[in-house]
Amino acid sequence: MEGHIEWFRDQVIFLTGGTGNLGVCLLYKLTLHLPTKKIFVLCRGSVQRALDKLEAAMAEQFDDVLDSHRVQFMVGDTSKPSLGLKPSDLRQLQDEVTVVINAAADISLQQPLHLSIQTNCIAHLELLTLICGFSRLKSFLHVSSTSVNSFLPDGIIEERIYPLCEEDPDPEKVLSHILHAGQSAYTENFVAPYALCKYLAERLILKQDNLPFNILIVRPSLIGPAIRDPYPYYGNDEGMPLHSAIYNLATDPDYGLDELGKGINLDAVFDEIPVDLVANTCLAHLAAGSIGIVQAAGSLYAASTTGEITNTMIESVAPMAIEKLRRGEIRQSQNLAPMFYQVLERYMRTWDIRCGRSEHLKEHTGVLGLSLDGHDAKAFMKHRWQNVTNLVFGLSST
């Protein structure tokens, strides 16, 4: 893997979504683990806002990232023409950038289709158009999601595009209808509107012909806390759907701990992967010159069933907290439990998400490897849920 690490020495990277869950991990690795020449980070609102988010996410590593003197922040917005960049900033990107990593997304499961299509499809297509003017660009990495295939029946899911239905409608026509009508007949086939939007983005990005740079699409499954980088258990709850779901379901009197397992397939594998393994997958495939679709799912880590996760979580909650929950003393102010329950019902399926293009990385330790040497997945999960239940309920069993 040494050659792959050295590849970064000549790369100037433009990163969107750099203050998000995956983006922070990518930025950490690009600055402190890899000899990356330079990283431009798009930040919305102000540079100070981005710095505050980065410091909150990785307080102990924050100064080292800045002290690398290889990170330059640029104020902009993926929803605006030309990313809302100053003309001088855009010219600098056009002249210097060799790799674009698009990790920006709005993963809200509540966002209606007519809004999600703008942030999770249109913005990506406009970014692709913009970067066609980057004179030194070699590769475009677009971060997608395995949820793009949530319309499929149970079974094997390969690293490829699947048609929406037997007739396979033109994705441009599907997009046009959504923009005109604000809805789609295909929405209900997906776990959430977000997933349909990401599906269309994939189809339309890969439909582009004769581009002068490589296109790589990485599909993570649900992202979980880091096992190593930037530190164990790194990750904010907003970027980890399972934590949000547990919090809202467990604290809702109509669901609660006693009802968590009812109506959900407890034997289904809960497909989740640590955020740092997703980052390693992205960066290793970039350096290898991979193109097309790469999946980063639970098979690259340690599979757990929904029942195992639920039992471990319940065992981590102190009896006093359980009684408080049952008496309704611990409540969530927003009534999001029905939405999360519906999503879990749709998501808890017997899909077998294949990650064949990355299996070889499990044999490699180090910066870009996926080896689990020295990592105890069961102990990690137990400690993780002790941390989560302590934060959610204020108490833990230990």
Indicate where each model-derived feature is located.
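NAD(P)-dependent short-chain dehydrogenase/reductase
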Residues: 156-177, 193-195, 199, 203-270, ...
